[in-house]
Amino acid sequence: MPISKIHARSVYDSRGNPTVEVDVVTETGLHRAIVPSGASTGQHEAHELRDGDKSKWLGKGVLTAVKNVNETIGPAVIKENLDVKEQSKIDEFLNKLDGTPNKSNLGANAILGVSLAIAKAGAAEKGVPLYAHISDLAGTKKPYVLPVPFQNVLNGGSHAGGRLAFQEFMIVPDTASSFSEGLRQGAEVYHKLKALAKKKYGQSAGNVGDEGGVAPDIQTAEEALDLITEAIEQAGYTGKIHIAMDVASSEFYKPEEKKYDLDFKNPDSDPSKWLTYEQLADLYKSLAAKYPIVSIEDPFAEDDWEAWSYFYKTSDFQIVGDDLTVTNPLRIKKAIELKSCNALLLKVNQIGTLTESIQAAKDSYADGWGVMVSHRSGETEDVTIADISVGLRSGQIKTGAPARSERLAKLNQILRIEEELGENAVYAGQNFRKSVNL
């Protein structure tokens, strides 16, 4: 079925920054996708095209990317008369049209918007939900797997004020019997945590960060973990809800000294207190021994390969590569060869097409890795990643706290999918690292 129209416009993300929205029109109707954007972005990511005109949107406009869709990509795709169900051919065509390895010509934000909107058109033409279409494209087996929601309930690092260096502390309801029960448990812990934060750190500690987590003026990781552990206990889930961290350590790595500065938000940080990767690895291990930590993301900087391999050899929890791998096939291949981590954080806008995202997941699965599908800190009401997570059987999704509508939109979509699938789906639960084999 031919595409009759492709139209892009500039809309806003959850941080008030412009982003690209794409409409694709076929005989089945209008199919729309909105592209997210990140705050702490890896330098090896596909290129997000921003206008750079400081007089508008502080340089963050996306009018060039929108124009690229409306004047270059759209007309070329329509002229090519591609079948919307053949996602890999469409994405290959988009990449050829751009002609650069990192999509810097037309912009990954322009290309991804078109790729995802066409995927929705493909699902509609087949008369199936988007997750089912993605499952077909990826060749995943049945039953469907509903992911464990990794809920970012406490923010530090680049996402928050206080001195806390680590970026995200997540609760993991992996012993729940279903997705909906896991989400309920998470919401209950979140409310206890909010009340505790206000009580201990004052009323403003209940204010939420970019991803819905609280951001009290916390100094250390121990302090954050104690607060979360107490909230879990108050909610009655001790031993049932686990914890995950996203350290985002590239943000506080000192490449000259090859050290990590846990006081990086302090301009007068004392260099004698900066840590070597071995010292930082020991800190993680001591935290994992004391708290119920099941997953650590980006424990080391994106090009500190030696540190990753060192840590991997001696750890038994999930080690997730985000800035390290940036959903990029070449980086994933290198991480597999060097035995750097055992799970991929999958962000569709890091690579820029649905087909390449599916391939990144398959490459990771092939080496026994886990895959966690992720939002970005600048999100929208678009729920595509919920369908991607179910379609790929990823077993884990990270989409913020159970707060702020752009975060809940994804979680609510999985609730709908759970209801629709009924007995034809299983909850990943404690098998979240191996859910592709369930």
Swiss-Prot record:
Catalytic activity field: (2R)-2-phosphoglycerate = phosphoenolpyruvate + H2O
One cellular-component annotation, GO: phosphopyruvate hydratase complex
Named cofactor requirement(s): Mg(2+)
Gene3D superfamilies: Enolase-like C-terminal domain (3.20.20.120), Enolase-like, N-terminal domain (3.30.390.10)
GO MF terms held by the record: magnesium ion binding; phosphopyruvate hydratase activity
Cofactor: how and how many bound: Mg(2+) is required for catalysis and for stabilizing the dimer.
Entry EC no(s): 4.2.1.11
Subunit structure: Homodimer.
Matching NCBIfam families: eno (TIGR01060)
Residues binding substrate, per UniProt: 159, 168, 297, 322, 374-377, 398
Entry keyword set: Cytoplasm, Glycolysis, Lyase, Magnesium, Metal-binding, Stress response
Pathway(s) where this gene product acts: Carbohydrate degradation; glycolysis; pyruvate from D-glyceraldehyde 3-phosphate: step 4/5
Protein name listed in UniProt: Enolase
Annotated compartments: Cytoplasm
InterPro entries linked: Enolase (IPR000941), Enolase-like_C_sf (IPR036849), Enolase-like_N (IPR029017), Enolase_C (IPR020810), Enolase_CS (IPR020809), Enolase_N (IPR020811)
Induction data: Down-regulated when grown with elevated levels of potassium chloride.
Function as written in the Swiss-Prot or TrEMBL entry: Involved in osmoadaptation.
Domain of life: Eukaryota
Gene Ontology biological process terms from the UniProt entry: carbon utilization; cellular response to farnesol; cellular response to osmotic stress; glycolytic process
Predominant location category: cytoplasm
Cross-referenced Pfam families: Enolase_C, Enolase_N
Catalytic center residues: 211 (proton donor), 347 (proton acceptor)
Source organism per UniProt: Emericella nidulans (strain FGSC A4 / ATCC 38163 / CBS 112.46 / NRRL 194 / M139) (Aspergillus nidulans)
PANTHER family: ENOLASE
